[in-house]
Amino acid sequence: MGLAGTKVKQRFGLDPRNTNWSNNNNQFGHQYLTKMGWTPGKGIGLVPDSITTHLKINIKTDNAGLGAKLQKRNKDANELDECSGVDAFQRILGRLNGKEDAVNKVMDMKRDDMIINGKMGIRFVKGEVLSSTWDKEKKALISYANGKNEDKKDKDEVSLLRKRKVEDEEKREVKKSRKDIKEKKEKKEKKEKKEKKEKKEKKEKKEKKEKKEKKEKKEKKEKKEKKEKKEKSDKKEKKEKKDKKEKKEKKEKKEKKEKKEKKEKKEKKEKKEKKEKKEKKDKLDKESSNAANVESTKSLVSDSSRESTPTPIASRLSVRSKWIKQKRASVMDAKALNEIFMISN
């Protein structure tokens, strides 16, 4: 293929010819063969002159079939193609090139070779002889010599031959009948032996099969029982686990519920306490605010022009009452209101 072909990477080992193994004399095989009388360079087996060198392997890198290169090497360069119609074409080309005789000679040789060595159908004809010169009964040539003695001799010979032939045929028939009887007897015995053997084998096979089936049934039964036991134990374990899980869940739910109830009770209690505290506080604020209102009205009536110093209230709500008083004083004072609303006189 050249450069256009696929690249084939070849990797060879450190010892592709395996020379390390063949040169190593310390191995068991080498020592054993040397004890038996073998020496390096000799063949192994009956014939000592066998192959003593290593086999060389040719790596196949193309897609051609086995033996393609050998066929190409042995092919004659001047061999003509075997396509249909090429012979006539070659003759025409030879005539045009002025080599008609040479081409015709090659073509004729090729045709003769095909006829002689080609795989063609051959018809065999049975040879016959002249009926007038051959005696079929005697299987010999007929002699036409004249004479009475010869005729008598011939007749006697013919009669003797016929008698012998009859006797031979009778003997053959007797032998054949005896042989047939013997063969029939042997065949019968063989048949009986064969039938007995087959019956015995069938019986043994049947017994083996029954034993095997019994064994398989027993094993299946044992497996089934084991499986059922295992399933029962698994079911029991699963049920116990489920019951434990349910109990645990119920317990956890109960604990959660109790915790929730406690928490709700606590929250309710805290809310109630807060509400009570708030109510008490609001009540005290109202009382203090009422007292502050009364005092402020008194101070305004007594002296409207100057600011009156409030008397301190000896109570825990004195700070709030003071703030309320200041707020009320600013609201009641006209000058302060003008400053708040930015009204000029």
Curated annotation (Swiss-Prot):
Basic residues bias: start-end ranges: 187-227, 238-278
Sequence ranges assigned to domain G-patch in this UniProt record: 25-71
Feature: compositional bias, Polar residues: 289-312
GO molecular function annotation: DNA binding; enzyme activator activity; structural constituent of chromatin; telomerase inhibitor activity
Protein localization: Nucleus, Nucleolus
Nucleus found in the keyword field: yes
Biased composition (Basic and acidic residues): 228-237, 279-288
Swiss-Prot/TrEMBL GO biological process terms: box C/D sno(s)RNA 3'-end processing; negative regulation of telomere maintenance via telomerase; nucleosome assembly; rRNA processing
Pfam family, one: G-patch
Keywords of this entry: Nucleus, Ribosome biogenesis, rRNA processing
Renumbered residue ranges of the record's region Disordered: 1-25, 166-317
One GO CC term on file: nucleolus
InterPro entries: G_patch_dom, H1/H5, PINX1
Domain of life (superkingdom): Eukaryota
Function: Involved in rRNA-processing at A0, A1 and A2 sites and negatively regulates telomerase.
Family: Belongs to the PINX1 family.
Protein's name in the database: Protein PXR1
Species annotation: Lodderomyces elongisporus (strain ATCC 11503 / CBS 2605 / JCM 1781 / NBRC 1676 / NRRL YB-4239)
